[in-house]
């Protein structure tokens, strides 16, 4: 069966509880928004395929499953992530300050070459702003990441954020591919969930052979 | 920590080791409200994997006993007729010793410094309980049904070695062929032996379709006699006998004809499922699996809180009514706890001591062109012991920096020769010089009860090669405690995922 995409990127959303990670995710994947705050239950990851420079890119975006509430994100969450969006809430100073802690977490557990981006969410609520745009930009410069202010509710800059991150990952990947001489080797990992990997059993092999 | 713990939940789970994680995910999946607590700042408890820079934490989980003023303070949280019971902190992992071994070739710069300077320390994933998965075993089935398989990746254990020892040559490590192709290419067997092996495999194929009773009948008087006698009678020569017994021996020590046949069928059933080898190893180490089940639990609403001093439980009329953590009272209907937490007043029904040594090396015990993930059954060198094996994992399984390996020795303590002695003999023979080692004793403690009817004690760490018994015990505990609920039932596929399904397969194949 033909592949329906050229690249698959695993992306993560990280940030304090209540900054709107799940809303950002839903806005991007389903173009929907729900105002009521419910701690994340039952959201694992969402998928949206986008097109960049004629290439189809499947984005698999993982939510924290609420494990950020007591800073108990599993280290396993970071495995294989190619891009991470750090989210804070512009109406919550604390969530902005904590971005530093989250970055430390990423440096400890994620791949060292993971692409990062900082977004200040809820920028539609100007009257309750606690963190100026300027400070957000400064922080991003400090960590050498891109920066956007977004609103999942007003649908501001959400697509831009994901497209920017995806573009950065894509160009890095293409550079690496060129350096590796056209193909990035795969190390033969097994995904036990995908039925496609399953081969015939030993028995069926043998009986075939014996017949 | 700005958030408070909930006042009341259906189930409090204490400890984030694999069995507790499986049980927490099963509870959350079944719709129970779950609070999952751990005293450590990390996941996995006594089943955890550590980086080289964090591994010292394994020695740091001391818990102070409550003094009388603390007890009287906590007692203020009790109501009438309630009794405070202090939770235990059993020594599941004890006698821990860790050393960097100075080596001549690192004279200029010790390996520790080399690794630190190249920031490679965090590339290690050092398992406390290294195990493998049978491709068609209970764990793989549970991972697939629950879709925890989304969170983990695996590598095939692509080399099985079987040692032989002679006074002249010392210990030689012989590759054991698993698949049909490997058998035909192997030089270790003659044409005649290969033919005998084919005959044996054909017999297994037929035997595997029979039920237990009929299978037993086919083995006739040999059923409970040693497997070797039965193989002899099938016309299998001595070399091939030891070959077969060594290969399946990793699943079944000292097999009788009956248990040997069962193990052979189990082995062959898993061969070819994901590749030539029947065994899988989790990428980033076995500690990942606990975390993956915790994520499933979290996706279904379980609340996670690590690094909390979990101090006591509250008992009333023979039942536990609450847990006290960090001075907060959380009411609950059930408690699931790892053996570590069982109150000191409750005696263990049995304790098995497991000897564990982990070595870090920069050379494989048997060098090959490509890096291999190796399983080595030491049973023939320690015939008295129930368990003795080595597992060598490296960069490909994301458990060590490139060019480095971890060698895990696991053994029960019967007999005169320790697994340590044998492992070190093998190193010497193959000119492998470990630069780091950690040794400890793991106590596999079983409890029939934890002193109250609504407390479930999770299965202990064990020395089994694979996960079937852990998964099975968790299932049984869950089904006995909550007979009306399903244990990790097959997940309903969302529409979106169905669309995606063929693509996922593509990824796996590429």
Swiss-Prot record, chain B:
The keyword Cytoplasm applies. GO terms for cellular component: cytosol; nucleus; Rab-protein geranylgeranyltransferase complex. The keyword Cytoplasm applies. Changing residue 107 to K: In ta208; embryonic lethality in some animals and reduces brood size. Some animals have abnormal germ-line development and gonad morphology. GO terms for molecular function: GTPase activator activity; Rab GDP-dissociation inhibitor activity. Its main location: cytoplasm. It is found in: Cytoplasm. SUPFAM superfamilies: FAD/NAD(P)-binding domain. GO terms for biological process: intracellular protein transport; small GTPase-mediated signal transduction; vesicle-mediated transport. Disruption phenotype: RNAi-mediated knockdown results in mild defecation defects. RNAi-mediated knockdown increases the levels of unprenylated rab-27. RNAi-mediated knockdown disrupts the localization of rab-5 and rab-7. InterPro entries: FAD/NAD-bd_sf, GDP_dissociation_inhibitor, Rab_escort, RabGDI. Keywords: Cytoplasm, GTPase activation. Expressed in several neurons including head neurons, motor neurons located in the ventral nerve cord, HSN and CAN neurons, and tail neurons, and in muscles such as body-wall, pharyngeal, intestinal and anal sphincter. Also expressed in seam cells, the hypodermis and the intestine. Disulfide bonds: none annotated. It holds the Pfam family GDI. Substrate-binding subunit of the Rab geranylgeranyltransferase (GGTase) complex. Binds unprenylated Rab proteins and presents the substrate peptide to the catalytic component B and remains bound to it after the geranylgeranyl transfer reaction. The component A is thought to be regenerated by transferring its prenylated Rab back to the donor membrane. Plays a role in neurotransmitter release from presynaptic terminals at neuromuscular junctions. Positively regulates the function of rab-27 in synaptic transmission most likely through mediating rab-27 prenylation. Belongs to the Rab GDI family. May interact with rab-5, rab-7 and rab-11. Does not interact with rab-3, rab-27 and rab-10. This is Rab proteins geranylgeranyltransferase component A 1. It comes from Caenorhabditis elegans. The gene is rep-1.
